Curated annotation (Swiss-Prot):
Name of the protein: Class I hydrophobin A
Positions in coiled-coil regions: none
Keywords: Cell wall, Disulfide bond, Secreted, Signal
Disulfide bonds: 52-125, 60-119, 61-101, 126-144
Encoding gene (name): rolA
Taxonomic path: Eukaryota, Fungi, Dikarya, Ascomycota, Pezizomycotina
Organism of this sequence: Aspergillus oryzae (strain ATCC 42149 / RIB 40) (Yellow koji mold)
């Protein structure tokens, strides 16, 4: 009985001596604070639209779907050989598709930081023509690319 009382008191003392947890409990990165494709603050909307080119529009997208971002453990002598040769092995970043996009008006003196604060996902360049994979043999349609990945 004496051992269990001593053990309980030691445990209570150790727990009381722990430092408090940091943060607010709401997550360490709030909102758009972690952007995979950050843009320079001095970049204007006109410069950003020029980077997109004349076949794409500057847009603000509110949905990103990332696939393929995982770690795979291979076993055996030749395990993972084919996937590593095709570039799908460890370290591959996956594919990011942007959806639910709206156009950003191009005003030469407006900084890109203003629309970027309102976007839930990275500012992107989207094709002017509708990208559809309906009826195609391969079926790939990638209409939007994050602007930060082009800089």
């Amino acid at each position: 009985m004496q051992f269990s009382v001593a053990a309980v008191l030691a445990l209570a003392t150790a727990v009381a001596a722990l430092p408090p947890a940091s943060g607010t409990g709401a997550g360490q990165q709030v909102g758009h604070s972690k952007n995979d494709f950050p843009l320079p603050k001095e970049l204007t909307t006109k410069q950003a639209a020029d980077k997109c080119g004349d076949q794409a529009q500057l847009t603000c997208c509110n949905k990103t779907v990332k696939t393929g971002d995982f770690t795979q453990v291979e076993e055996g002598l030749l395990a993972g050989l084919l996937s590593n040769l095709l570039g799908a092995g460890q370290g591959s970043q996956g594919l990011g598709l942007l959806d639910e996009c709206t156009n950003i008006p191009v005003i030469p003196i407006i900084s890109i930081a203003s629309p970027q604060e309102k976007c839930k996902q990275p500012i992107s360049c989207c094709q002017n023509t509708k990208s559809s994979a309906d009826g195609d043999l391969v079926g790939i349609g990638l209409p939007c690319i994050a602007l930060g990945s082009l800089l």
